[in-house]
Amino acid sequence: MAESIRRKLALVLVASLLALAAPFSVADTKETIEAGASQALGRLRAHSAAAGELVDQAHAVLVFPDVVKMGFGVGGEYGEGALQIGGVTQAYYVIAGVSFGLEAGAEYKSEVILFMTEEALRDFRNSSGWQVGVDGAVVLAKEGAEGAIDTLNSREPVLGFIFSNRGLIFNLSLDGAKITRIAR
């Protein structure tokens, strides 16, 4: 019961933070999202040649160039992105999530999700809202020997990368994040 109350309070807090920030935020335009996606993919390729090869092998790439995560004890994250097939944007999406733990402040990161099979892409596109860990699993890149990306999980249907300007981030998760298509 205490856990239920804690979660409800957390949701109210996150909703309040988002409501306060709403008047100051403007939804990104198609051009802004696409330019950000292109820059994010360039940074990912610069961080890891193996990641670039996986991007090239993917049936589709979902790029969230600027995901902001903020909170104090309870946090939330939000970002807008583009689904690209063959380098051409097909649709626009938002990613949002709530997290619990020792958090304070705000951080920016990029998230890239690779659909390695046609079936995984079809399941994603046919959903009205896709929750990571519920509607499909995203296997995040793992650090292998000598700091390289472990490509053993490249056989998974959906792969993910989280990174900042400093490089790949290996200790985070996308579980629980909700991805929803938006009109642009």
Listing of model-derived features with the role each one plays in the protein:
Residues A2-L13:
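Bacterial N-terminal signal peptides that target proteins for export
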Residues A27-R184:
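Small-residue-enriched, tightly packed secondary-structure blocks
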